[in-house]
């Protein structure tokens, strides 16, 4: 979005009506930032989403960017390079971040829940472009400070509480911007409040005593390689976060009411350095055994104990006599083989006896069993037919005998 030099007002808080299409209000019950957005009776709109940055190809502002409207309001009517950068910073969400997301820096739970979960703090591909632009702008400001305003830029110590007087020229405006930039660094939120664990394994560079914190503003950016692009894409494993370390080295914390864990995790004061940190996501291991012991009722516990004892006894029996079970199986197998052999021998002898009873195969020692059975069947049928025939003959003979007896009786009676 191009920035025009003829602006109607020096105050860079743009009218809300002009950018109203880019904001939205959520429902009352679904607004998660309602507690942080409400100050008295004023409601602040949420910051635009990541789609707005991608749509207008804007560079995302670094997190924790403080407001520097007082110094910019006192600048000249024609915005200089520093004024344009400040306008870009505020337009990209510097003040909106401070008013919408970080309304209460002391509320650690709110900062952790909002900064880590919001899409603007998760880091995306525009972070590298932002670092590059900031590096170029800072180099230009340092060169202009050395040429035009060495006296104003070399002032050490904390910044004055009131607004500074308006500068005389563009060089003084750049030096004043650097001075306000170093002063606003003290208002930034400590990264240890947001991330209670170490953010980077590399130690920051130490600042020489008496140096201006704004002059030491550097960019610690690794070269853009394929591995860096792959790391940025793998957002499930790592989150790319751009943070600002505090620049006041002589300032020491005197609060004794902080917790021991926060004191242990709080990093040392270092120069104002724009650096990229990788935060590992720790996932709970749901496969781990439960730490608490489950208490069962007395009856159920007794039943479980008895079941365990019986199972242990059966396991002991199985484990104590493996050889005995093997020997028993061998004996059973041997007995089965002996009985099977006896059965076969008896069957063979039966076939031999049957063969001897059949006249057709009696002399054939090599007659197969099928032939023996077939001939035996035929022989049985023939014997049965002979039996029926003999029974019929016997009946005829019995009748003949009865007739002869009756005839004999008649002859005896006739003689008498």
Curated annotation (Swiss-Prot):
Under the heading PROSITE patterns, the entry gives: BHLH (PS50888)
Comp. bias (Acidic residues): 228-240
- Where does it mainly reside? host cell
Q: Which UniProt keywords apply?
A: DNA-binding, Host nucleus, Oncogene
Q: Is the Cytoplasm keyword given for this protein? A: no
Q: Where is the composition biased (Low complexity)?
A: 212-227, 245-259
What the entry lists under PANTHER family is as follows:
MYC PROTO-ONCOGENE (PTHR45851)
Q: How does it assemble?
A: Efficient DNA binding requires dimerization with another bHLH protein.
Q: What else is known?
A: This protein is synthesized as a Gag-Pol-vMyc-Env chimeric protein. The sequence shown here corresponds to the Myc homolog fragment of the chimera.
Q: Under what name is this protein listed? A: Viral myc transforming protein
The encoding gene is: MYC
């Amino acid at each position: 979005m191009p920035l025009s030099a003829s602006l109607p007002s020096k105050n860079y808080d743009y009218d809300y009506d002009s950018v109203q299409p880019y904001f939205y209000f959520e429902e009352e019950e679904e607004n998660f930032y309602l507690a942080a957005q409400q100050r008295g009776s004023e409601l602040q709109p949420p910051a635009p989403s990541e789609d707005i940055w991608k749509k207008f190809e804007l560079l995302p502002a670094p997190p924790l960017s403080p407001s520097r409207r007082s110094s910019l309001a006192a600048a000249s009517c024609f915005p200089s390079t520093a004024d344009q950068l400040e306008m870009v910073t505020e337009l990209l969400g510097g003040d909106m971040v401070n008013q919408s997301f970080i309304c209460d820096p002391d509320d650690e739970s709110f900062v952790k829940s909002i900064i880590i979960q919001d899409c603007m703090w998760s880091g995306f591909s525009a972070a590298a472009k932002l670092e590059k632009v900031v590096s170029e702008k800072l180099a230009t400001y340092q060169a202009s400070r050395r040429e035009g305003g060495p006296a104003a830029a070399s002032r050490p110590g904390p910044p004055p509480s009131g607004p500074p007087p308006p500068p005389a020229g563009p060089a003084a405006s750049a030096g004043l911007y650097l001075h306000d930039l170093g002063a606003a660094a003290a208002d930034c939120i400590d990264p240890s409040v947001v991330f209670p664990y170490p953010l980077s394994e590399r130690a920051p560079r130490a600042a020489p005593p008496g140096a201006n914190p704004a002059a030491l503003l550097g960019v610690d950016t690794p070269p853009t390689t394929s591995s860096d692009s792959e790391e940025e894409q793998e957002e499930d494993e790592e989150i790319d976060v751009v943070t600002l370390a505090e620049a006041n080295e002589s300032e020491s914390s005197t609060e004794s009411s902080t917790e021991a864990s926060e004191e242990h995790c709080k990093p040392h004061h270092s120069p104002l350095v724009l650096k990229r940190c990788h935060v590992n996501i720790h996932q709970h291991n749901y496969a781990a055994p439960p730490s608490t012991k489950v208490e069962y009722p007395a009856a159920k516990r007794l039943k479980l104990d008895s079941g365990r004892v019986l199972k242990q006894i059966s396991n002991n029996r199985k484990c104590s006599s493996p050889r005995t079970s093997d020997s028993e199986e061998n004996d059973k197998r041997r007995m089965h083989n002996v009985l099977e052999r006896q059965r076969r021998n008896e069957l063979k002898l039966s076939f031999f006896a049957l063969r001897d009873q059949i006249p057709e195969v009696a002399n054939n020692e090599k007659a197969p069993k099928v032939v023996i059975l077939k001939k035996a069947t035929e022989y049985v049928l023939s014997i049965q037919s002979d039996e029926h025939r003999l029974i019929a003959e016997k009946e005829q003979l019995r009748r003949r005998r009865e007739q002869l007896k009756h005839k004999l009786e008649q002859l005896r009676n006739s003689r008498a």
